[in-house]
Amino acid sequence: MLESERRFKPKIVGATDGDPSVDFWLIDGRLMPRSNVEKQLPRGAREMSDLSIRIGHMDELNIDVQVIYPTIFIFPTARRPEVDLALCRSYNRWMADIVKPAPDRFRWVVVPPLLNMERVAEELKFGKEHGACGVYMRGLEADRRLSDGYFFPLYDAAGRLDLPICVHSANGSIASHDFFLDEPGFCKFKLAVVGAFHSLVNDGIPERFPQLRIGIIEVSAQWIPYAIHDLARRHLRRGKQLSKNVLKDKRVWVTCQTDDDLDYILGYAGEDTLVIGTDYGHADNASEIEALRKLRDEGKVAAPVIKKILDDNPRALYAL
C-alpha cells in the first residue's frame, strides 16, 4: 500500500468470547469472517508463502497451471471509493509479486476497483502486464447488476486487453449480502452469479462487446439448463430466437463439478464451454482438491470431452 493508504489496511480481530479458532477481518468498519480455510494443506502452500511446496503438490495432482482467485473479495469489502482503490491496488501488486518467480505455473485474476471506474483500466493494464489472465467480478457489484451501463468501460477495457471477466461465487452488494447475512451462501453468493449470467445474456452484453469473454466460476453447472430454458422463453416473447449453442455463441465458459450431471448439462452447454477447478486452499462445498484427477479417472463422459474440460477449454477462456 502507499503510505497515504496504510490507514485503510485490513485488521485482524478476535471473537469477543476469546475463541482462538474464530477471527475476522475488519475493513472499512465492516467485519468479515476470516475462515473457510483448508487447514489440512501446508500453510506455505495454502497461502503461497512457499511456492515450492505448492508446486510440488500441483505436480502430485497433475495440475500444470493454477489460476488464483482471491478469498477476501467474496464479500463487499469497502464502503468508500478510496478504501476500495487501496485494497484492490495493494492486492494486485501483492499477487504480481507472489507469482513472479513461477509465471509458467501460476496465473491470477486482477481485482478492479469498481467504486473508482476511472481507475479500472489502469489496474487491468497492470494485471495484464504482470501475469493476470482474467478480471475478478462478483455476482452483484456496487449495488448494480452486471449488465448495467456503469460497467461498460470495464468490459471495453477487458475486451481490448484480451482478459475475460470472471464472475466468481461472491457478492459485492452490501445491501444484498447483508440481507442474506445468516444464510449459508446459496442465495447470497451462488444465485447472485446465476442471475449475473442471465442478465448479461438477456441484456445483450456479449453482442455489445464482441471481444469480451465471460467466465462463470464456482457455482456448479447444474443451473445451466434452467437458465437457458428461461432465456429461450423470454426471447420468444420478444420475437427472437435464442441460439442453440448459447454459451459458445456468447463466449461464456462455466466451471462444473465432478458430481454434476454432466451428460445432461452437456446437452445444453456443449463440449467447448465447461471448465473445472479445485478451489485450492478453501474448505467449503465447492472445494474439490482432486477434481481434475477424479474427472479423468471416473470417466463419466467420453475421454475427448474430458480433455476439453481439463485442457482445451481453460486455454480458450483464459487465453493461456
Explain the meaning of each model-derived region.
Residues 1-320:
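Helix-coil boundary/capping segments in enzymes
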